[in-house]
Swiss-Prot record:
Record's protein name: Uridylate kinase
Gene3D superfamilies (UniProt xref): Acetylglutamate kinase-like
Notes on how activity is controlled: Inhibited by UTP.
Pathway this chain belongs to: Pyrimidine metabolism; CTP biosynthesis via de novo pathway; UDP from UMP (UMPK route): step 1/1
């Protein structure tokens, strides 16, 4: 393995839950700062980075719908939660000298930029991190699908998903002690085995556009930069297992 990154432009999907840290709700600023430092390592190595952040640490549309809320309204609330997370991450990145722009799929001009694909590409070409907020801007679509969509639109070489575990397992390793860990999978493996990596539409988008999905532990300091060089512990999902 070399220290040179294998990818020139990547999208990092961060779940809202990952930003809770040890808490049960909300944004843990120490965790946000640590993720920001990991991103800076990649930027310093010459990688162009964009992000999609979930909102499950604040509000999850599916949970709201399950409790009787109209699904569309619940999803819009979840999208607004992602904007809060995006602003927190922007603040953390800029505090350590990484120029960052937030673009929202739901226009809110006094808070951040609207999503404009060509502008986002130019930002990354200038070395800025772009954080895509508010998912796709449409209800009934997850932030995983938004991540796959933005990765395709931005021409990313890979989609990285930072989770609480170091790859994809046959079952939740926190609940099933003998769960099998996979180093490599195909897109069809994920769909056929119903592995809980991303939803089917996100997997299909990545597959159709030949974008590998790399699942790694966001809780491991420096893990993001390591995975980009091929040295980190992760699961790679592509056409070739």
């Amino acid at each position: 393995m070399s220290d040179k990154p294998l990818y020139s432009r990547v999208l990092l999907k961060v779940s809202g839950e990952a930003l809770m840290g040890p808490a049960q709700y909300g944004i843990d600023l120490d965790t946000v700062d640590r993720v920001a430092r990991d991103i800076k390592q990649a930027i310093d190595a010459g990688v162009q980075v964009c992000l999609v952040i979930g909102g499950g640490n604040i509000f999850r549309g599916l949970s709201g719908a399950a409790k009787g809320m109209e699904r569309a309204s619940a999803d819009y609330m979840g999208m607004l939660a992602t904007v809060m997370n995006a602003l927190a991450m922007q603040t953390a990145l800029e505090a350590i000298g990484v120029p960052t722009r937030v673009q929202s799929a739901i226009p809110m001009m006094t808070v951040c930029e609207p999503y404009i694909r060509r502008r986002a590409v130019r930002h990354m070409e200038k070395g800025r991190v772009v954080i895509f907020a508010a998912g796709t801007g449409n209800p009934f679509f997850t932030t995983d699908t938004a991540a796959a969509l933005r990765a395709v639109e931005m021409g990313c070489d890979a989609l990285l998903k930072g989770t609480q575990v170091d790859g994809v397992y046959s079952a939740d390793p926190h609940k099933v002690a003998n769960a099998e860990r996979y180093d490599r999978l195909t897109y069809m493996d994920v769909l056929a085995r119903d592995l809980k990596v991303m939803d089917a539409s996100a997997i299909a988008l990545a597959r159709e556009n030949a974008i590998p999905i790399i699942v790694y532990s966001i809780d491991e300091p420096g893990g993001f930069a390591e995975v980009l060089t091929g040295a980190g512990r992760c699961t790679i999902i592509s056409d070739a297992a």
